[in-house]
Structure formats: structure tokens, C-alpha cells
């Protein structure tokens, strides 16, 4: 079954704001979160929790 072009749950990259270049890959619901996501997650390079922002 083919996916729709404008998927309701697209795959997005979350990049660390600490400047380490570490990324997480996740899905988001466009209807609930139309803006860019900002989450606090663990960055193993600096061994701390930092903000991760959605990349486009």
C-alpha cells in the first residue's frame, strides 16, 4: 500500500542544540504539532539532557 504524499505522521530529525551534531529520528503528528518540535532528550556525546529541535 502506497503512502500519501502529505503524510499525517512524517518522519522528522531532532538535532541537538548543544552543537554536538547528535540526532534522534522520530515521527510527529502534523495535526497536533503543526510547528517545529522541541524536546528535552539525552545527548550521549556530552552526557547531559539538552533540547533537541526539529530539522527540516
Swiss-Prot record:
Keyword Zinc-finger: no
Cross-referenced Gene3D superfamilies: Ribosomal protein L33
Pfam families in alphabetical order: Ribosomal_L33
Gene Ontology MF terms: structural constituent of ribosome
UniProt KW Transmembrane keyword: no
Keyword terms: Ribonucleoprotein, Ribosomal protein
Sequence intervals crossing the membrane: none
Top-level lineage group: Bacteria
Record family assignment: Belongs to the bacterial ribosomal protein bL33 family.
HAMAP family registered for this protein in UniProt: Ribosomal_bL33
Entry protein name: Large ribosomal subunit protein bL33
Gene source species: Tropheryma whipplei (strain Twist)
Gene: rpmG
Amino acid at each position: 500500500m502506497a503512502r500519501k504524499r502529505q503524510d499525517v505522521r512524517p518522519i522528522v530529525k531532532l538535532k541537538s542544540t548543544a552543537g554536538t551534531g547528535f540526532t534522534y529520528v522520530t515521527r510527529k503528528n502534523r495535526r497536533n504539532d503543526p510547528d517545529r518540535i522541541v524536546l528535552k532528550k539525552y545527548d550521549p556525546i556530552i552526557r547531559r539532557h539538552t533540547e533537541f529541535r526539529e530539522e527540516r
